[in-house]
Amino acid sequence: MKLLLLALPILVLLPQVIPAYGGEKKCWNRSGHCRKQCKDGEAVKETCKNHRACCVPSNEDHRRVPTTSPTPLSDSTPGIIDNILTIRFTTDYFEISSKKDMVEESEAGQGTQTSPPNVHHTS
């Protein structure tokens, strides 16, 4: 039982002491490590997950960038499909007027004024 209690803290602390067990991720073309703080002689090249820095040894040339194959361009001459897919955008304009303007127009358009009908209530 004492051996188990002694082995348990060792297994818990082992990943913190040994980087290989700590799971430090590789970054920057597998030449750097993600850490909270870089060691002496290391430079920060990018940001890793969980707010960690990608620490790369500064004595090596790490300007290598992953190579990608160039994307071949198709025929650049416009075809019939390009003409069909051309969309012209139009904007509709609306005229906004106030109630006062509308009342003035309606009064000018009506030749005669009619009074509202009288309503009689009987009980």
UniProtKB/Swiss-Prot annotation:
GO terms of molecular function: lipopolysaccharide binding
Compositional bias of kind Polar residues: 109-123
Alphabetically ordered keywords of this record: Antibiotic, Antimicrobial, Cleavage on pair of basic residues, Defensin, Disulfide bond, Secreted, Signal
Ranges of compositional bias, category Low complexity: 66-77
Disulfide bonds: C27-C54, C34-C48, C38-C55
Signal sequence residues: 1-19
Propeptide: 65-123
Region (Disordered): 58-77, 100-123
GO biological process: defense response to Gram-negative bacterium; defense response to Gram-positive bacterium; innate immune response; killing of cells of another organism; negative regulation of cell adhesion; negative regulation of lipopolysaccharide-mediated signaling pathway
Protein localization: Secreted
PTM comment: The three-dimensional structure formed by the three intramolecular disulfide bridges is indispensable for antimicrobial activity.
Cellular component, GO annotation: extracellular region
PANTHER family per UniProt: BETA-DEFENSIN 123-RELATED (PTHR15001), DEFENSIN BETA 118 (PTHR15001:SF7)
Family assignment from sequence similarity: Belongs to the beta-defensin family.
Function of the molecule: Host defense peptide that exhibits antimicrobial activity against both Gram-negative bacteria, such as E.coli and S.typhimurium, and Gram-positive bacteria, such as S.aureus and B.subtilis. Inhibits cell adhesion of E.coli on intestinal epithelial enterocytes. Causes rapid permeabilization of both the outer and inner membrane of E.coli, leading to morphological alterations on the bacterial surface. Binds to bacterial lipopolysaccharides (LPS) with high affinity, and may thereby be involved in immunoregulation through LPS neutralization.
The protein, known as: Defensin beta 118
Species of the source: Macaca fascicularis (Crab-eating macaque)
